[in-house]
Amino acid sequence: MRLSLTKVVNGCRLGKIINLGKTGDHTMDIPGCLLYTKTGSAPHLTHHTLHNIHGVPAMAQLTLSSLAEHHEVLREYKEGVGKFIGMPESLLYCSLHDPVSPCPAGYVTNKSVSVWSVAGRVEMTVSKFMAIQQALQPDWFQCLSDGEVSCKEATSIKRVRKSVDRSLLFLDNCLRLQEESEVLQKSVIIGVIEGGDVMEERLRSARETAKRPVGGFLLDGFQGNPTTLETRLRLLSSVTAELPEDKPRLISGVSRPDEVLECIERGVDLFESFFPYQVTERGCALTFSFDYQPNPEETLLQQNGTQEEIKCMDQIKKMETTGCNQEITSFEINLKEKKYQEDFNPLVRGCSCYCCKNHTRAYIHHLLVTNELLAGVLLMMHNFEHYFGFFHYIREALKSDKLAQLKELIHRQAS
């Protein structure tokens, strides 16, 4: 695996990760995202419908929490999780936790980390964790770490220091066991940067992890509420400055379009794509614009779309003041609302996804209010394609030095 940078502008990194996978014949563009999955499958979608989506990332994200209870079956299967789930050609990255599902705190010790499956808590020692990775045989996997400390809330310096110490100890033990394993020789360990909101510990974690022979870095614990954004971004800039240029940087828990752009400007390469899934689960469709050089002939359509965005933002503000449905963002529209009952427009004008080419907002509204499973399928197809298209436009904007225009467009739509 090798990271090839073609351009670095104001911290933003444009390039490719080449020689990926066990055969070394895969590539992945950066900045980019991973394909979010549930137990190895894209939510709501079959493999056939997934193949109808344009721009699907080369690497899928699996979560250890959803696969841990099946590791004995996979160990007996002996051919890895990729073939087992019907994705033998895909690159696979195994993370510890599902970014959508919060984990209870207080279950990390000096010897183990807990993950939470459908059946409950699964305690992971280093040896058990590496045995499961041997059964899964992923291309990349997140190292075991103490990720209970984040920027979300203030934590004592003593607890933050313990988090960094534990994570480094877990990393050393995992690297030792990887050396002893023939099966995992072609798998890449991703080192985890911890440290909460304490600058000194963040920098120590970054410097010490960079000394180890890891294939890349996961920036953990940077998710949080808007009030902590400035602090998080300052920490992020300092951490990425300590990391080597020739290894990829992933970030967990960050997926909103406006936050993605802020992180890219601070040197982050890869993101999780759970945001489209969350939008789908709310019965919403992504409608934000990322075309920073619109066709003049489409100006009228763009103006109509802008008016709708303004109405949507006003509605969100009203909901926030009443304490209702605060999760909905200005990047989406809520198709459960009655006003879409007779709206025969596509979800997004000009969108090339299967849903927009074949169905209308009114039809999706009908599917949602009647609780039809097809609603989730069509919304997931659209939301994934829209989100993956956003990353394509980010790369194009970097190539043409237009990221500032794209960022301005996205922030005008953010609430």
From Swiss-Prot:
Binds 1 zinc ion per subunit. It comes from the Eukaryota. This is Queuine tRNA-ribosyltransferase accessory subunit 2. One of its GO terms (molecular function) is protein homodimerization activity. Its cofactor is Zn(2+). Heterodimer of a catalytic subunit QTRT1 and an accessory subunit QTRT2. NCBIfam families: tgt_general. It holds the Pfam family TGT. It is a peripheral membrane protein. The keyword Cell membrane does not apply. Belongs to the queuine tRNA-ribosyltransferase family. QTRT2 subfamily. InterPro entries: QTRTD1, Queuine_tRNA-ribosyltrfase, TGT-like_sf, tRNA_ribo_trans-like. One of its GO terms (biological process) is tRNA-guanine transglycosylation. It is found in: Cytoplasm; Mitochondrion outer membrane. It comes from Pongo abelii (Sumatran orangutan). GO terms for cellular component: cytoplasm; mitochondrial outer membrane; mitochondrion. Non-catalytic subunit of the queuine tRNA-ribosyltransferase (TGT) that catalyzes the base-exchange of a guanine (G) residue with queuine (Q) at position 34 (anticodon wobble position) in tRNAs with GU(N) anticodons (tRNA-Asp, -Asn, -His and -Tyr), resulting in the hypermodified nucleoside queuosine (7-(((4,5-cis-dihydroxy-2-cyclopenten-1-yl)amino)methyl)-7-deazaguanosine). Keywords: Cytoplasm, Membrane, Metal-binding, Mitochondrion, Mitochondrion outer membrane, tRNA processing, Zinc. PANTHER family: QUEUINE TRNA-RIBOSYLTRANSFERASE ACCESSORY SUBUNIT 2. Zn(2+) binds at C351, C353, C356, H382.
